[in-house]
C-alpha cells in the first residue's frame, strides 16, 4: 500500500464515521507566537480544546504537515541516523470536541488498523494509564485484546501524572490519560514490550496515540473533570507506512525511496544506503514546505531554522563529493510524490526551487573554506588526543562562514568529537553585547508604569481639548514634574496621538497646559495600551495630574495615513501581479514614504512595477470609502481579511477594508482612497535571499518627485538641444557620435605611436651589443605604451626597453626585452627596478612586463638609471 493510499484511506475512513476532513494548516502556527512550527495535528484545534473557539463540527480528521526542528521539539541531530526521526512528517489524526470519547475512539482505531489496513490483531499491543480502568476494560472486554498484550503505565517520570501515558497541554489546562498502540515486528528484532527494561529496542514500535482529555488541571494540581471530554489522536504517516509496507525503517517506504534515489542522482552516488542521502531526502520535504508556507531563509527565528536545515543538507551533499548546487533540483521529485495531496506545493514549485537555489549558491561560496578549517582543526585535535572542539572556533565558523552550530556539531559527532558549547555561547553573547552597546534604544523602552491605560481617540480626531497627565519620565526615571528644557516622556489618560505600531511611525505634535508647551517628537508604547509621548518641554512647567490639550501635527499625519493606506493597496496589487506567495515580511510607514518588504525570489521587472502602480492608482481614482470594523479574529479570517504569519492577535481584531484590500490593521488610514492622491514606486531591491523591498511615495511627495523628474528631463533635453519627446533618439545619435570619435582617437594614437617609435629608436644606446632605451611619453595611456613597445622591439631587433608615462598623478610603466636577450635581462626585473624608485612595484613575463607607481616626480631619474642597470646584467 503506497503512502498516498494510506493517507487517503485514513481520511476516508473517518469521513465515513461522520468526521469533517480538515485540510492541513500552515507549518507556521496561526495566532500562536509561543510555537515555532506546527508539530502535531492538534495545533490547529488548540483553541477548540481550550474552549475559546467554536467550529461548525464536533468531529474532525486531518493529515497535518508537521516540523520538529529547533526550539523545544527538535529532532534535527538524529535525522538520517535513526530509522524514525524526521524534521518533516505527516500526522494523521481524528478529533472529538465533546462528541464521542474513549469507547468510540478505541473501537475506531482498532477497526481501521485491523479491517481497513488489515494488520494482524495478534501483532498489536496497547498501553493505558495505570489508573485508567475504563480504557483497560474497553480494550480487554470489548475489543478483546488479551491481558498479556495490555500494559498499564504509571507515573514513570518522577512526579504525579508525569507519565508516558498521561498527556498535558501545559502545566495547567486540559489533560488526561492516553492509550498507545504498538506494532510487534517479531522476535527477529531486538527489544521488549512497552514498560519493560528493553522497551527502547526496535521490536515494538508505537504507531498511534489516543489522548483522552477529561480533566482540567489548576495551578495547585487539582484535577476537575471537563464538562465535555475530548479526543485527540495522532498516528505518524511514515511510521504506519513502514509497518504496512513490511519494512523496518521509515526511509525504506516508497515515498522516501523515491527521494533518496533523486538525492543519489543529483550527488552522483550509487550506494543508496548512505546516511547522507537519507538526510537530504528528509530535508527537502521540510525546506520545501516551509517555503511554501512563507518562511524565508534568514538569521533569526523560523528563517534561521530553515537556513540551518538547508545548510545541513548541503553539507551532506558536500560530504558525498558534490561541490555545486544540487538540492534545489529535487523539488520537482518532491512535487511528483506529494503534489497531489498538497496542491499548494505544486503551485509554489518554481518559487521554492529558486529560493533554495539562491540559498545554495550563497553557502557554496563559503562551505569549502569553512570545511577546510574545520577538518584541519579536527585532525590537529585528534593528533593531540583531544575530544572537544574549541567553542571559539565553532563561533568563527558560524560568524565568518555561515556554519550553524548544529552543523559543526554534526561534523564533529561523525568523528566522535564534542563541541565546547559554553565557549561558543560566550562568544555569541559577547557579539550580542557589542551590538547592543552600539545600538540606540528608544527612550520609552523599559519605563515602569502601573497607572491606567491610555484611551486612543486618534481614529476620529487629531485634537483633544483636555487630557490628564498620568506619568512623567526624565532620563528613564519617573518624576512628579518636568522643567523647561528637559527632554522626557509624557503619559496621558486620553490621546489623539498614534503610538508607533504595526510599522506605522508614531505621531508628532504638541501638548499644552497654561504656559507649558511640550513638543512631541515621537509617540511609542510603554506597554501594550500605554502611550509614551516623547519630546521636550519648551516652556513652562508640567506636573503629574495636569490637564493638557493634545494636538497632532495634522499635515504629518495626513502624509502618514496616505502612505499607510497605499501600503495596503500595494500589498494587494503585488499579490495580484506576482502571485499569492507574496507575504509581508516587514514595513515602515512614515510621513515621507512607505517601505514594504515581502517574500519574492526575483527582482521586479519594469513592467511589473508599472502594473502595480496602475492597479494602485486605479483604486485611488475610484475613490472608494475606507471601512474599519471590530470583529472576532476567526470571523475576520473567514471574511477574507489577510492576517500576517506569526503575529499574535487579540480575540477581537480591527479589520480595515480599503478598495479591494482587506487586512487586519490597527493603524490610521484615509477616509477614501482618493485621499491618497497619487502613488509612485521609487525604489525596488533585495534585502535578503527571497526578500524584496519596495519604497513608494504618495500625495504631494509623489507630485514633487514627478515634477523633479520632469525638470531633469527638460534640462537634459536642453543640453542635447532636443525636445523631451525626442530625447531617446537624440541620445542614440550622441552615442553614435561618441563611438565614432573614440574610434578616430584610437586611430590617431596608433599613428602617433608609430611616429614616436621612429623617433625613439634613434635615441637607443648600444651597450655591449644590446640596444637600450628608457623614455617618457607624455600623455600616453597604457595601450599606447604597449603599441609603441611592440613597434620599437620590431625596429631595434635586439633590445631592452622601458617606457613610462604620467596620467592623473600616477605612473604607468612597461618594459620589453627581445627574445634573444631574455637569457640575460628579464623584463619583469627591469620594470620592477624602475617601479621601486617611483613608489610602486610590478612584474610579468621575461619579454614583457608592466608596473605602476605613485611618485611621478621621480620618473626621469629612475629612467636615467636603466642603462647602468642593464650594463650590470650583461
UniProtKB/Swiss-Prot annotation:
Protein name in UniProt: Alanine--tRNA ligase
GO molecular function: alanine-tRNA ligase activity; aminoacyl-tRNA deacylase activity; ATP binding; tRNA binding; zinc ion binding
Entry-linked PANTHER family: ALANINE--TRNA LIGASE, CYTOPLASMIC, ALANYL-TRNA SYNTHETASE
Residues at which Zn(2+) binds: 564, 568, 665, 669
Single GO biological process annotation from the record: negative regulation of DNA-templated transcription
Domain of life: Bacteria
Catalytic reaction annotation: tRNA(Ala) + L-alanine + ATP = L-alanyl-tRNA(Ala) + AMP + diphosphate
EC number: 6.1.1.7
Family membership noted in the UniProt record: Belongs to the class-II aminoacyl-tRNA synthetase family.
GO cellular component, one term: cytosol
Function: Catalyzes the attachment of alanine to tRNA(Ala) in a two-step reaction: alanine is first activated by ATP to form Ala-AMP and then transferred to the acceptor end of tRNA(Ala). Also edits incorrectly charged Ser-tRNA(Ala) and Gly-tRNA(Ala) via its editing domain.
Organism: Cupriavidus necator (strain ATCC 17699 / DSM 428 / KCTC 22496 / NCIMB 10442 / H16 / Stanier 337)
Alphabetical UniProt keywords: Aminoacyl-tRNA synthetase, ATP-binding, Cytoplasm, Ligase, Metal-binding, Nucleotide-binding, Protein biosynthesis, RNA-binding, tRNA-binding, Zinc
Domain remark in the UniProt entry: Consists of three domains; the N-terminal catalytic domain, the editing domain and the C-terminal C-Ala domain. The editing domain removes incorrectly charged amino acids, while the C-Ala domain, along with tRNA(Ala), serves as a bridge to cooperatively bring together the editing and aminoacylation centers thus stimulating deacylation of misacylated tRNAs.
Cofactor binding remark: Binds 1 zinc ion per subunit.
Needed cofactors: Zn(2+)
First-tier enzyme category under EC: ligase
Protein location: Cytoplasm
